[in-house]
A protein has these predicted regions:
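Extended beta-strand/beta-hairpin segments
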Residues: 1-16, 24-132
Length: 132
């Protein structure tokens, strides 16, 4: 629409807010899970799809026919452990709890955005990457 790519796009900032909030929420959830979840950090690889029809609809002096919004955020959350090993079930449970508690994820869902983030251990991610 404009600019010279000298700064982040607004949608990139929304994704950055989601990642930051989910990192903080994951740390909180891991700390309070029993037995404690040995979380070191989570690496996110996310992509967003947006409906631009509302933003670019003409004529400009009429209300757009649809809302301009994110339709979908998808990708992976790759969990790195501080020690030991964890079951896939516990990693997936961590992801579910984070998604349930993250305020930014909740705001996106409330706007009608579909979130499809697959939580997996770093080792699983590397194994899956080699197979694909």
């Amino acid at each position: 629409m404009g600019g010279e790519d000298a700064a982040p796009q607004p949608v990139e900032l929304v994704l950055a807010a989601l990642v930051g909030c989910e990192q903080a929420t994951a740390a909180y959830v891991a700390r309070h899970t029993r037995p404690r979840f040995p979380l070191r950090y989570v690496h996110f690889d996310l992509r967003a799809t947006r409906d631009e029809r509302g933003a670019i609809a003409l004529p400009i002096d009429e209300r757009p026919p649809v809302s301009s919004r994110l339709l979908r955020v998808e990708g992976t959350a790759i969990v790195h452990l501080s020690r030991g090993a964890e079951s896939r079930a516990r990693v997936e449970a961590l992801g579910r709890r984070v998604e349930e508690r993250c305020p930014v994820a909740d705001m996106l869902r409330a706007s009608g955005c579909e979130l499809d983030v697959r939580w997996q251990m770093a080792k699983d991610f590397l194994d899956d990457d080699r197979e694909g």
